[in-house]
Amino acid sequence: MNHKRVERIWRREGLKVPKRQAKRKRLWLNDGSCIRLRPQYKDHVWSYDFVMTRTHDGRPIKILTLIDEFTRECLCIRVNRNITSWDVLEELSTLFITRGIPEHIRSDNGTEFTAKVVRKWLSELGVKTLFIEPGSPWENGYIESFNGKLRDELLNGEIFMTLLEAKILIESWRREYNEIRPHSALGYRPPAPEVICLQPKSATLSVVQ
């Protein structure tokens, strides 16, 4: 049954036909956001996302994961009860100072990533944001694959008694993933040895007020 027939039935029954909602568009920022960009070198494209889990008492844990799509290295995992756009900025600030600034960052349209303060700050540093189509996680395949490994290899098999325990075990897993775990796309070598340390690009890292 198509939508026109449904509307005819509604009118026949004297019901008000609801106005059609405009199809939600992905976020356009005039910076190539809708281009499916493939990573070509280190710091070309980073991507980040969230994973959810719980402690044994049922309280939620929110996990921010961030990777370099080219090297596959997990640059950080932040674990807390809640993570806001300001927490995202704090994590990015630390990485930009210690690792350098990427050309692009890919993410979904979560409010923590699309917040005006985050977009403005990244734009001022020259970082282009790549937002995927809503409901299309396959467009963010690198981080989705990483998050799947995190779930399968750790989260699904662990019962975290406390938030602190979760932080310790997840960070331990991240280090093993980077330094020991072989990756098929890297010739069955771990991501971290593939990383060439470059001098961070010069930039003033100030949080937008």
Question: Language-model segments: which ranges?
Answer:
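RNase H-like polynucleotidyl transferase catalytic core
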Residues: 19-22, 105-109, 124-142, 158-163
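Mobile genetic element proteins and their domesticated derivatives, centered on retroelements
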Residues: 6, 10, 49, 66, ...
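Active-site beta-loop-alpha junctions of metal-dependent nucleic acid enzymes
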Residues: 59, 77-99, 111
